[in-house]
Design a protein with these regions (language model features):
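Alpha/beta enzyme core
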Residues: 4-15, 28-90, 100-189
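Short catalytic-loop micro-motif centered on adjacent basic/acidic residues
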Residues: 20-24, 94-97, 118
C-alpha cells in the first residue's frame, strides 16, 4: 500500500473512536520493525523521522550540525526504507516529520517522500509562528502533504532544545492560530 497523508488517518480515528500512536524511527531497522509490529496487529502506522534523524540518516554522525543537504539525503533514505518495507503491506502508513525546525527542513522532508510534516514554531512569537506555519501549509498542501503545527512549550528537553518553563496553550489562541493558517493539524499543549 502506498504511503498516505496524516489527515485521512486522523479522520478515521475520530470516526471510529480509536487512539493512534506515532513512533519515531531513526534507522532503517527501526522502520522495518515498526511496520512489522503494526502489520501483526493490523493497525495503521504513523512512523516519524525527526529533523535530527534526517541529518543522521543523511550520513552526518554529528547530526546536530547537519546541513540542509544532509537532511534532504536522510529524508529520502528514511522514506525509501519505509516505502520498501511498506510496499506489500495492507496497512495504511504515514511518514511524518517530527519537529521540523524551519521551512527548509519541511521542504526537505516533503521532497524526500514524507506524507506529513510538523512545523514546530512554538518557540517563536505567536505571529511569527502563524506566518511560518502558514508558509509550510501552503507549500505542503499543494503537494498533498498534511501539516501539524505546534503551540505551547513544555519545560525540559525535546529534540535537544531546552526550555526552562512551560507555556500552555490558550484555547482561544489555538482557534485563532487555526483560523489564520488555514486547514492544518494543530498539536495543542493544554
Amino acid at each position: 500500500m502506498p504511503l498516505i497523508p496524516l489527515r485521512p488517518l486522523m479522520e478515521a480515528t475520530i470516526k471510529y473512536g480509536f487512539g493512534q500512536g506515532a513512533f519515531n524511527v531513526n534507522a532503517v531497522a527501526q522502520a522495518k520493525a515498526a511496520i512489522e509490529v503494526h502489520e501483526m496487529f493490523r493497525s495503521p502506522a504513523i512512523l516519524q523521522g525527526a529533523d535530527l534523524a534526517n541529518g543522521f540518516m543523511g550520513g552526518r554522525t554529528d547530526f546536530m550540525n547537519a546541513t540542509l543537504e544532509d537532511k534532504k539525503i536522510g529524508a529520502k533514505n528514511i522514506a525509501d526504507a519505509v516505502k520498501k518495507y511498506g510496499a506489500d503491506s495492507e496497512i495504511p502508513i504515514v511518514l511524518h516529520l517530527d519537529h521540523g525546525r524551519d521551512f527548509d527542513s519541511c521542504v526537505a522532508a516533503i521532497s524526500g517522500g514524507y506524507t506529513s510534516v510538523m512545523i514546530d514554531g512554538s518557540s517563536l512569537p505567536f505571529d511569527e509562528n502563524v506566518e511560518l506555519t502558514r508558509e509550510v501549509v501552503k507549500y505542503a498542501h499543494a503537494r498533498g502533504v498534511s501539516v501539524e503545527g505546534e503551540l505551547g512549550v513544555l519545560a525540559g528537553v525535546e529534540d535537544h532544545v531546552f526550555s526552562a518553563s512551560s507555556t500552555y496553550t490558550n484555547p482561544l489562541k489555538a482557534v485563532e492560530f487555526f483560523r489564520k493558517i488555514g486547514r492544518a493539524s494543530c498539536r495543542e499543549r493544554v
